[in-house]
């Protein structure tokens, strides 16, 4: 995968005193719009991506694996439709999210039922299930910190991240022994 070299760059920058942070979701696949630079031919080539590793995530081709013809059609006629690309390895995500400067992230968007990427709804439950309960790579307190206070501090968002008088009380209650992600890829 390509994440290890990226982590090396961040580590080197932080070692020089640079204020560099990162975030990661919990999925080795990712999604974005067909018309973005992410899916231009040079980027696909530079990252050794294959059309067969991509699936249409929205629109009339939802769930269809791409070939060159469908790729061209989506890029040029349906640039606002999403494509999911399968790349990376789970161990890379686990390594990245153990870094003290790494925050948990998710995607946002309005999608019809059965469309979009499961990261929209499944990221945080998957993070807690995999990183805390199953793999024991993080303690619960550290995991919650990476989802709450760390982003609030990093992005200087006032009134967020802790339970204190005058702060917004954004609470999520969950059973640490039962939390799980139910989100799935489009059919």
Predicted segments with their positions:
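C-terminal cap of metal-dependent C-N hydrolases
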Residues: 94-101, 106-109, 171-187
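Acidic, glycine-enriched loop/beta-strand segments at the rims
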Residues: 84-87, 138-144, 152-186
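A broadly tuned preference for mixed-charge, low-complexity surface segments
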Residues: 8, 12-16, 20, 149-164
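A glycine-rich phosphate-binding loop feature that marks nucleotide/adenosyl-phosphate handling sites
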Residues: 24-32, 147-148, 167-171
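Active-site neighborhoods of metal-dependent hydrolases
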Residues: 1-136
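Feature representing long, continuous alpha-helical segments
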Residues: 103-104, 122-126, 130, 142-145, ...
């Amino acid at each position: 995968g390509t994440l290890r070299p990226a982590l090396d760059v961040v580590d080197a920058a932080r070692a020089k005193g640079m204020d560099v942070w990162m975030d990661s979701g919990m999925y080795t696949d990712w999604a974005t719009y067909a018309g973005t630079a992410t899916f231009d031919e040079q980027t696909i080539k530079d990252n050794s991506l294959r059309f067969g590793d991509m699936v249409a995530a929205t629109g009339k081709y939802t769930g269809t694996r791409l070939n060159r013809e469908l790729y061209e059609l989506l890029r040029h006629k349906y640039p606002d439709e999403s494509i999911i690309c399968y790349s990376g390895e789970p161990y890379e995500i686990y390594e990245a999210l153990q870094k003290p400067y790494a925050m948990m992230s998710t995607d946002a968007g309005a999608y019809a039922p059965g469309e979009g990427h499961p990261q929209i709804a499944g990221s945080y439950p998957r993070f807690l299930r995999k990183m805390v309960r199953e793999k024991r790579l993080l303690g619960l307190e550290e995991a919650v910190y990476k989802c709450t206070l760390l982003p609030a501090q990093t992005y200087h968002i006032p009134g967020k991240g802790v339970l204190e008088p005058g702060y917004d009380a954004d609470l999520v209650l969950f059973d640490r022994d039962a939390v799980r992600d139910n989100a799935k890829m489009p059919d």
